[in-house]
A protein has these predicted regions:
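FMN-binding flavodoxin-like domain, especially the glycine-rich phosphate-binding loop
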Residues: 3-7, 11-25, 29-241
Length: 241
């Protein structure tokens, strides 16, 4: 959340310049995962300067705030973000709230027979092929790589109900993350105790604030229609829905 990742082993790059870089990453606490954040903060990441970049995200259901941070890191590196493709969990938010942890702890994507499988569906995985074919076509024809690459291809899908929840959740993660960093400086045991308390708080937050914000947004939707449309267009850039 605070973009202070643990260090990674120095990656070995085969070239000094690339025509295109695809950055695939997962979302941790509404932020880019620590490994990819560590790379983007390394000296090796300077190779992205003036280079077209495509981001590829696989996550449960929330990715907007993570991509905002990714955009800022790429901008700081003078990279050129030309596309973003996102695939999310095949089940709804409430089902995945159960199936995702079950998958993590058991290794079984469908731990509960009465719930959908966790993770991205096979159909969505197959759907990635048409983005690959489009990219191959552009490269083979020596066309210029720009933001039109994946436009009008359904590269991302913005869930209006989650936009407010993401902002609230990210604010919570930021505040608690700052508190946990301070607690760790006092005592690892103290930090662990506060962390356990936060886990309980987080579960309560998900079960209360997320549905409440969705209800509030639905009630206010007629009044916020234009604002929501602008936000959707912004978050969908550069590929669009």
């Amino acid at each position: 959340v605070h973009l202070k990742p643990a260090p990674i082993e120095k990656p070995i790059l085969q070239r000094e310049k690339y025509d295109l870089v695809i950055i695939a990453y997962s979302v941790w606490f509404l932020s880019p995962s620590q490994p990819i954040t560590a790379f983007l903060q390394s000296e090796q990441a300077k190779i992205l300067k003036n280079t077209p970049v495509i981001t590829l995200i696989g996550c449960r259901n929330m990715w907007l705030m993570a991509q905002e941070k990714m955009k800022k890191m790429l901008t700081a590196l003078d990279a050129n973000l030309i596309g973003n493709v996102v695939k999310t969990d095949q089940s709804n938010a409430w089902a995945s709230f159960i199936t995702t942890p079950a998958w993590m702890f058991s290794g079984k994507k469908r731990y509960f027979s009465w719930l959908p499988s966790a993770g991205i569906s096979d159909a969505d995985m197959q759907d990635m092929q048409h983005f690959g074919r489009r990219l191959v076509q552009v490269l083979n024809e020596n066309q210029h790589l720009d933001k039109s690459l994946f436009q009008n291809m359904g590269a991302v899908k913005i869930d209006e109900k989650l936009m407010m929840s993401e902002k609230v959740g990210h604010r919570s993660f930021y505040i608690w993350g700052k508190l946990l960093l301070k607690c760790g400086q006092i005592s690892p045991a103290f930090r662990q105790a506060v962390l356990y308390f936060y886990i309980v708080f987080l579960i309560i937050l998900i079960l209360t604030v997320v549905p409440l914000s969705a209800v509030v947004k639905r009630l206010l939707k007629p009044l916020l229609k234009e604002k929501l449309a602008r936000q959707k267009r912004y978050f969908a850039e550069p590929s669009g829905e």
